[in-house]
Amino acid sequence: MGRAMHDFDILVVGGGHAGVEAACAAARMGVRTALVSFDPARIGAMSCNPAIGGLGKGHLVREVDAFDGVIARAADAAAIHYRMLNRSKGSAVWGPRVQADRKLFHAAVQAIVATQENLTVVPGEVAALRFEGARVTGIELADGTALSGQAVILCTGTFLGGKLYRGEEIMVGGRIGEDSASRLAEQMYGLELPMARLKTGTPPRLDGRTIDWAALEEQPSDGEDWTLSALTPARSNPEIFCGITRTNARAHDIIRANLNRSPLFSGAIDAQGPRYCPSIEDKIHRFGDRDGHQVFLEPEGLDTHLVYPNGISTSLPVDVQLGMLRAMDGLFHVELVEPGYAVEYDHIEPRALTSGLRLKDVEGLYCAGQINGTTGYEEAAAQGLIAGLNAACVVLDREAPALDRATSYMAVMVDDLTLHGVSEPYRMLTARAEYRLRLRANNATARLTPLAIELGCVGGERAEWFARREEKRARLDAALDSQASAKQMQDLGLPVKSDSGKMALREWLRFPTIDFPDLAPLVPEVDTGTELAAELAEDAAYAPYLARQDAELRELKANEAITLAADFPFAEVPGLSSEMVERLTAARPETLAAAGRVPGVTPAALAAVLVHTRKRGRAAA
């Protein structure tokens, strides 16, 4: 390795979803970036389920895409099954989800990484972080190679101190067949960083040729034309169906009879697993009254017989896994290709991080993905993007992107993590966002791409596409300002009262019985059937509700503008109880708005902090 490979601006450790987004985001910003991976050939591999998106998660994917990220483009290149979840509810909580061909997804990520300017892939195990005082200055590889950088982003996934469990078997590793980052984990514990352990798991992989598909309920792809990335012109792959079966009393009996052989119940694993993706043994133990649990049989690709049984993550012994599977309809003769297993791993206490995902007490050290206590590809990708952008802004001496709970699900997630911490793997849900009417999956581009362009992390193709989109948006906006009378509505066959008067088309769209395409004869100069037209129509429909939030948002913005120093002396605030001092000192919120979201902090305490910040400001002036 020549000296040119030794010196970088940013070093990203780990080639999973967080690492890829962090490295590519930093490189798009123009800084020299190294992506360090155990095995570069595995960069972009899907460790668990072959799917991208879902409830809350689809919002994150679209937001990462708005910054010209990788995950949505790769998912579209690999998509073989599409579902828009929550379609029966309002569009604010719709969840776009695609099932991906693993090989195609991996190939798409590899191609994007290989062609990304300013990005160098470095093979090797990171053995240690290098420091000067309290600042990280680089990393050392297991072979002794030293790489220097102004920032290091740890995206270690489940590899940091990873252990794999299957029945009585215990193996060292972060993923089956791959080693764990044990030396780096030892160093981080030695640095007395706030660390803990969490657990996740994966189901067995099945041989699809041994499944009786005719005995299963079919779940077809949705047949529409939406995609995850705004830059994807159309769906490109054949679409397949998934099968649905259920666990049953016989399968439950097999599981119950062998709970003592599960590491979750034998005491081998004491780390907490994900609440919203429990193992099948956990489901049977906690929900013993249920007569069955759905299992979605998802083909892993177009040219493979592997099938992913979504819903039965397990670490039971192999013989028990096979027995419970063969008790289910359609699986009486199924064969296992790879048994399921659980993985326990180290993570950072996320309250030790800033809103830019930098460790508060270590300059230049960032963390993203499962190392921060989250679960899921989409959560990891979003954190990788945020860490990469913030680290690049420090290198370039630019202001970091201003994201808050009213502008993105990404900021909701980071705010939840850094203020509340985790006691179990965190996953994104639409219910976590109090401003979700503003944060629809289909308006991520409008919300975030202008900021992305301002930051300089958007490529030429997306910038040109966005400029054309804005021209179309302006024409649609002008059309929505057109006036129409109740009689004109009735002439179109729309059920409105004669005394409704004359209104702008955007106001007529607030009527639940009127859709934008219904108004096409009134505005022939625009296409009312596009995704962009639907987005603007939804903006119009939600406008009265959003207006009611405006005062609340103004207060949020004002409080976000009041910053609190990392060493803010809460103990010196007059009238602040010892409990409030303890809570605020532990959380170390960066703004007054963040202080208000610390659990247990009262409005009175917040007012006292505000008064004290103003006094400090006057004294310093």
Swiss-Prot record:
UniProt key word Plastid: no
GO annotation, biological process: tRNA methylation; tRNA wobble uridine modification
Residues bound to NAD(+): 273-287
Xref: InterPro entries: FAD/NAD-bd_sf (IPR036188), GIDA_C_N (IPR049312), MnmG (IPR004416), MnmG-rel (IPR002218), MnmG-rel_CS (IPR020595), MnmG_C (IPR026904), MnmG_C_subdom (IPR047001), MnmG_C_subdom_sf (IPR044920)
SMART domains noted in UniProt: GIDA_assoc_3
Places the protein is found: Cytoplasm
Binding residues for FAD: 14-19
Coiled-coil spans in chain: none
Single GO MF descriptor: flavin adenine dinucleotide binding
Chief place where the protein resides: cytoplasm
A GO cellular-component term linked to this record: cytosol
Entry keyword set: Cytoplasm, FAD, Flavoprotein, NAD, tRNA processing
Cofactor: FAD
Self-association state and partner proteins as the record states: Homodimer. Heterotetramer of two MnmE and two MnmG subunits.
Function noted in UniProt: NAD-binding protein involved in the addition of a carboxymethylaminomethyl (cmnm) group at the wobble position (U34) of certain tRNAs, forming tRNA-cmnm(5)s(2)U34.
Similarity comment text for this entry: Belongs to the MnmG family.
Protein name: tRNA uridine 5-carboxymethylaminomethyl modification enzyme MnmG
Organism: Erythrobacter litoralis (strain HTCC2594)
